[in-house]
Amino acid sequence: MWPQYIGHTANAPLLRRPPEPGLDLGVFFLQHDHSGGEGWTWARRLLRRRGVGPQVGDGALGQRLRDFVSRSVTFAMPNRKAAYELTHIIFYLSDYGRQIPELPDGTLKSLHFTGLLAFLDQDMDLLAEVCAALRFSGNYPSPLWEDAIAAYHRALRVQAEPDAPMQDDYHEFLVTGWAMKIADRSSLAQTMPQGALRFHASRSGQGALRPLAACLNDMGAQRRADWGYMRPHVLSYLGPDSHAILLAAERSGPHFEQFFEGFARARA
């Protein structure tokens, strides 16, 4: 959940429950979130802003969060729900960058694995969250990742459109601009039109994640978890754009070989 919503009260009719003046969203989520996951964490953060209850990282819930973020093997495979839970947990534990959280071993690797998946897929929304989470945890993202986010954000176009659809690229605009702000980079400078707006991102190609997965699938039982062995096979399989993205991912940080070992799901 985004910081602009924190402190809001619940809209009872929208939530389809009897009116209850001043119902805080944190209380609502504590009452209605049964996953035992991010909803509870977010609710605890909201309540702490009112001076109620324990800190986000305290007790059994805090331990559960730390156990989750430290299981880096979870984040070597595409799982958007788990990926966003990871970044949001770091946001909450760091109080959105107000403090450096004490994180267990494995957390940094979890963030890097998630960032590699996002970069390979050219998913700039998720990659921006990973970069923000890395900075909030006291680490620096790969400059290649932040350069990609900056280029994506600056290519976004905002235009007035009376019948603008609800589903557009606003969230990508928001989170990539936010990540650039955290990194002290200048964000999109353009005059916002009046009225209903449409946010449009310029996308090219499909990234390298799907071609990489297709290559491994085509190799079947012959694929290996050893990136050194697999590298020439994979690179010869990919097209020019995917090839370039994969090479950039490989040099973006120190964890690519370990990431590939988990992603390949093959014997060493």
Map each language-model feature to its residues:
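Eukaryote-skewed repeat-based solenoidal scaffolds used as protein-protein interaction platforms
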Residues: 1-158
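Terminal, non-catalytic domain-edge segments
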Residues: 31, 142-268
